[in-house]
Amino acid sequence: MSGKKKESGKFRSVLLIIILPLMFLLIAGGIVLWAAGINVLKPIQDAAAKTPVLKELVPETENKKGAASSKDSSNTAALEKTIKDQKSEISILNKDLETSKSEIDRLNQKIRSLEKTAEDQKKSSEDHTEGSADSKASSENDKVISVYKSMDSGKAAKIIAQLKEQEALKILNGLSKKQLADILAKMTPEQAATYTEKIAASQE
């Protein structure tokens, strides 16, 4: 019992003489270093951060925070570059689209111009064809009339009386007044009266 008391007394003596003053010195030294701007905890934090169990308990150091911040800045810069590239690509596509619309409008205008030219040419061709047909028909009528002009009035009267009324009127209208009178005189009174009325009506 007395041996245990002696050991306990020795431990207290060591605690009071060595450990407590040493702890006081460490605390005082840490305060002085902290006041001088020296981070006395950094070496301890770095050592603890390398220990598998303790690294979860140690807060992030300035280096880690700086690295994380640098990584975030790098990611932000990459995203901004991607956004800028996408906007540039959109701008290029919009310009291409505007160019395509302009080209389409130009082609449509050209097509309309060609269609109008083709329509005008077709109309001109039709007018020319109609004019040629009318000229040809008129020429043929003149030939027929000239035949009846040179024919005997009695014979001409018999033939004209057998023709369709429209054809007969064309021939009679093309004759001179003397030739017309001679031919009508060779027709029956009924025929002469009918053709006289038709000729008078056509000349009104």
UniProtKB/Swiss-Prot annotation:
Keyword Secreted carried by entry: no
Region annotation Disordered: where it falls in the sequence: 115-140
Pfam families: MgtE_N
InterPro entries: Mg_transptr_MgtE_intracell_dom, MgtE_N_sf
Annotated keywords: Bacterial flagellum biogenesis
An annotated GO BP: bacterial-type flagellum organization
Tree of life domain: Bacteria
Protein name per Swiss-Prot or TrEMBL: FlaA locus 22.9 kDa protein
